[in-house]
Amino acid sequence: YLRF
């Protein structure tokens, strides 16, 4: 994922 992009943040997590």
UniProtKB/Swiss-Prot annotation:
Residues annotated as transmembrane: none
Predominant place of localization: secreted
Subcellular location as annotated: Secreted
Keyword Transcription: no
GO BP, sorted A to Z: neuropeptide signaling pathway
Gene Ontology CC entries for this record: extracellular region
Domain of life: Eukaryota
Keywords: Amidation, Neuropeptide, Secreted
PTM annotation (Phenylalanine amide): residues: 4
Family: Belongs to the FARP (FMRFamide related peptide) family.
Protein name: FMRFamide-like neuropeptide YLRF-amide
Organism: Hirudo medicinalis (Medicinal leech)
